Amino acid sequence: MAALLLLNRVSRSTSSISLHRVAGTLGFNSFNAQIHGDRISGTLFRVRSLATLAEGASHFNEMVSVNQRKYYLLGGKGGVGKTSCAASLAVKFASHGHPTIVVSTDPAHSLSDSFSQDLSGGVLKPVQGVDSPLLALEITPEIMKDEIKRQTGDKSVKNMMDSMGLGMFAGELGDLNLEDMLNAASPGIDEIAAISKVLQFMEAPEYSRFTRIVFDTAPTGHTLRLLSLPDFYDSSISKITKLKKKITAAASAFKLVFGKKEIQQKELPNELDQLKERMEKVRNVFRDVDTTEFVIVTIPTVMAINESSRLHASLRKENVPVHRLIVNQLLPQSESDCKFCSIRRKEQTRVLGLIQNDTELSGLKLIQSPLLDAEIRGVPALKFMGDLIWK
């Protein structure tokens, strides 16, 4: 309950390219040459498709043409390249004139590494090297926890219950160690912090000019908790409100018997109602086909495809719009006689066939992204990757 109320308060408050050569025989010579000197060449090397599933186009024109605000959430199994895909999309949006915010909700942040810039600290920071406004944020749960403590000050459980009109019962709850419970980090603090930022972006006037907001989400489990959190809070708030009414009625009866002072109804019900309305706004945004899209990122392995299929089923159950599937780290065709490479390409082709036959994934627009010969770090490299994926 404390987390619910504090979310309502906290969310209102303001808030060089490193290259790594791999598999030199695969014919990846062009990447280093094209991004050398922080410059992207106009001629990108071409990666042939490994299967005839789709052209591999992301239909970026439809993603960039609308001026109203759009939310894009990129997620999937850990280690598939979600951050690089999200960062490259944010750079692409900004390069096309859309003021953009990119947010990492993953507790193990790598957005700073992707942009080759320090984005830590839990505050929005401008990304260097992009013409249009591009701000980035790594959500830091520890900072939010400190903010919660700052806003609550040194209030004890007794004071908190007094504000609810239930101070007379505080002594009876001493054995529950509520003080320790409130001081401990919530298991869902990452998701609470992310939701609070979504609320800020939706409500604060200073964010109104940003027309694209990209989320680099945590691995699958965290992301599903994030998307289901508004429903969970909505249900919890309803239960808390009913419970308080029952306790207040019982306390009033206690007063009549023992002649205690009248219990005052404080601000809790109104604050809960306000939070309930705001949670409903977030829930509606996550499910709005006109403003939101979840992009699944995966790699061409059976395990990753299976998890992506389950993720899509869960997103469909939550009514979250999904239109695109990125298959990352595909080996391009090569004239090399590398036996290992040939075997891997054949296996990747087989896995792409599994997508075509998967009832959850076959209807999505397939985006094929190649395995590159370098780490994607810094804006020039992200522009290069963005031109390969988002076209």
UniProtKB/Swiss-Prot annotation:
Keywords: ATP-binding, Hydrolase, Mitochondrion, Nucleotide-binding, Transit peptide. Its main location: mitochondrion. Gene3D superfamilies: P-loop containing nucleotide triphosphate hydrolases. Residues 1-50 form a transit peptide. Its EC number is 3.6.-.-. It catalyses: ATP + H2O = ADP + phosphate + H(+). The active site is at 106. Pfam families: ArsA_ATPase. It comes from the Eukaryota. It is found in: Mitochondrion matrix. ATP binds at residues 77-84, 328. GO terms for molecular function: ATP binding; ATP hydrolysis activity. Disruption phenotype: No visible phenotype under normal growth conditions. InterPro entries: Anion-transp_ATPase-like_dom (IPR025723), ATPase_ArsA/GET3 (IPR016300), P-loop_NTPase (IPR027417). GO terms for cellular component: mitochondrial matrix; mitochondrion; plastid. Belongs to the arsA ATPase family. This is ATPase GET3C. It comes from Arabidopsis thaliana (Mouse-ear cress). The lineage of its organism: Eukaryota, Viridiplantae, Streptophyta, Embryophyta, Tracheophyta. The gene is GET3C.
